[in-house]
Amino acid sequence: FILSGAGLSAESGIPTFRDANGLWRKYDPKELASIGSLERHTQDVFDFYNERIKNAEPCRPNAAHIAIAEFQKDVAAFCDVIHVTQNVDNLNELAGSPRVFHLHGDFQTSLCRKCKKTFPRIGFYQREQVCPVCGANNFAVRPNVVLFGEVPHGMDWIPLYLKKASVFISVGTSGTVYPAADFVRETKASLRINLDLDPLIHPYSKFNHRVFGKCTETLPP
C-alpha cells in the first residue's frame, strides 16, 4: 500500500499546502476550499481552482513519480500494489503508474452538482459551463476535488486494503491531514516506511522505518 502526498509533486513545481511557502499560507482554506464557500462564493472558488489548474498544466513527473511507476510495474506479476494519492494532479499517471486512486479527487475530471456524474474536464470553470450529461449550467459544473466538509473518496474500501497490506509506504506527506493520517495506524502491515522531507512535523511513532529527504533523492534507485 503506497500513500503519497504533496511532497511527491513539489519538486515538479506544484506547491504544497502546508510548508513555509504553501498555499494555505496565501489563502484561507475555509474561504476558498470548503463546501460552504462553494455554495456562497462559487466564482471565487472557481477562480482559485482555475489558477491551480493553470499552474499545474506545465508540470511534469519527476524522478520520484517515475520510480513509483516502475516499482508498480516491476512487482505487478507477483504483488498487488495499490497507490492512494492525496494529490489532485495527474503526474503519477503521466509517469506511467498503472494503478492510482485519488483520495481527494483530481484536476482531470469535473463533477455536476445536479446529476452528480463525473466526466473529463474541459477548459476552466465558469458559470456558463454546461454538464454534458444532464445539460445543467449556472455553476453546475464544479471541480471534482474534495473540499473541506466533504468525505474523501474511497473510504468505503481503503480500510480493507490497509488491513490486507503487508507493506505500507508513505511518500511526501506530512501526516497531518485526516483521514489519511490514520492510515499508518489502521494498517496491519509489518513493514511501515515513511519517506518525507521534514522529520519534525509530527512524531512517526507508528512507522518502523524512516528515510528523511527529498522524494527525488530517497525514492529512485
Label the model's feature ranges.
Residues 1-221:
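Conserved catalytic core of sirtuin-type NAD+-dependent deacylases
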